[in-house]
Design a protein with these regions (language model features):
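Short glycine-enriched loop/turn motifs at secondary-structure junctions
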Residues: 6-10
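Internal nucleotide-binding/catalytic subdomain
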Residues: 12-153
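Conserved, structured core segments of small domains
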Residues: 148, 156-160, 165
Length: 166
């Protein structure tokens, strides 16, 4: 998996299936400067469904929102290039209470705590792009913002006035 290390409007990830696809993606990102000047991160290819866990964070205090899943691919059947998000849904049947507890206790809360320890505390939204693999929940990405389009299906489920959160 090749990821452009910078802003790419949700389109900077290529899951290359062949070396030719990988070379083409690297050429596009680095030599042709598709997203500007930057670097590329090479990651292991993981299998399993992706999901998004957004949390309200104030320092080490982390409050989860409902999990959601977006549809990234341009074509039906999860085919084609990644987009910035074609739609989303929530109430994910494949996520167990244990998965959510792991994501909170081993990913989201430790991340917020580490940000405080590094002198960069977050007050806002921490977005965890996660994947449920055969080996458990893994981190795909983090953002310090609401997920798009996931926010469209998550915010209506929050009972309180969101203005009170901030």
């Amino acid at each position: 998996v090749l990821k452009y290390d910078g802003l790419a409007a949700g389109k900077g990830v290529v899951s290359a299936e062949t070396m030719d696809e990988a070379r083409e993606a690297l050429r596009d990102m680095l030599l042709d400067g598709r997203f500007g000047k930057g670097r590329v991160v090479v990651e292991d290819f993981l299998t399993g469904p992706e999901f998004s866990l957004m949390c309200f964070v104030e320092g080490e205090n982390v409050y989860p929102m409902p999990v959601a899943q977006d549809h990234k691919r341009a074509y039906d059947g999860d085919k084609g290039p990644n987009t910035g998000g074609m739609g989303a849904y929530t109430s994910l049947p494949f996520i167990t209470d244990e998965d959510l507890e792991f994501a909170m206790e081993k990913v989201m809360r430790p991340t917020a705590k580490a940000m405080v320890a590094e002198g960069c505390p977050l007050t806002g939204v921490l977005y965890g792009g996660l994947m449920k693999t055969p080996d458990g929940v893994k981190v795909i990405e983090f953002n310090a913002r609401f997920g798009d389009p996931e926010t469209e299906v998550v915010l209506p489920l929050i009972d309180s006035d969101i203005a009170n959160v901030f």
